[in-house]
Amino acid sequence: MKVSAGILCLLLVAATFGTQVLAQPDSVSTPITCCFSVINGKIPFKKLDSYTRITNSQCPQEAVIFKTKADRDVCADPKQKWVQTSIRLLDQKSRTPKP
């Protein structure tokens, strides 16, 4: 009888924790960042630090988020020439070994 009660208790605990894990959606662990508008002007390259491409299907538009040296995030249109040039230059800069 004690063995049966112990097994039942163990099953209840396993079922409780198992449903909590299963109930958590995948999207909870990965926040979604979207741009709802993009900058109209051009940001000088010397002010840019890094970038992230936004291509999530849940976002209203494709965009590039530039992180400035002043630690600000700025959304830009990836189709604009200055954005493409800045991305290329930032990629080159990140591949260049630092002394």
From Swiss-Prot:
Disulfide bonds: 34-59, 35-75
Annotated compartments: Secreted
Function, in words: Chemotactic factor that attracts monocytes. This protein can bind heparin.
Coiled coil regions in record: none
Recorded superkingdom: Eukaryota
Cellular component terms per the entry's GO annotation: extracellular space
Entries under SMART domains matching the protein: SCY
Disulfide bond as UniProt keyword: yes
InterPro entries the UniProt entry points to: Chemokine_b/g/d, Chemokine_CC_CS, Chemokine_IL8-like_dom, Interleukin_8-like_sf
A biological-process GO annotation: calcium ion transport
Pfam families noted in UniProt: IL8
A GO molecular-function annotation: phospholipase activator activity
Family to which this protein belongs: Belongs to the intercrine beta (chemokine CC) family.
Organism in which the protein naturally occurs: Bos taurus
Keyword vocabulary terms for this entry: Chemotaxis, Cytokine, Disulfide bond, Heparin-binding, Inflammatory response, Pyrrolidone carboxylic acid, Secreted, Signal
SUPFAM superfamilies reported in the protein's UniProt record: Interleukin 8-like chemokines
In-chain residues carrying the UniProt-annotated modification Pyrrolidone carboxylic acid: 24
Annotated protein name in UniProt: C-C motif chemokine 8
Quaternary state and interactors: Monomer or homodimer; in equilibrium.
First-listed, main subcellular location of the protein, grouped into a coarse class: secreted
Residues of the signal peptide: 1-23
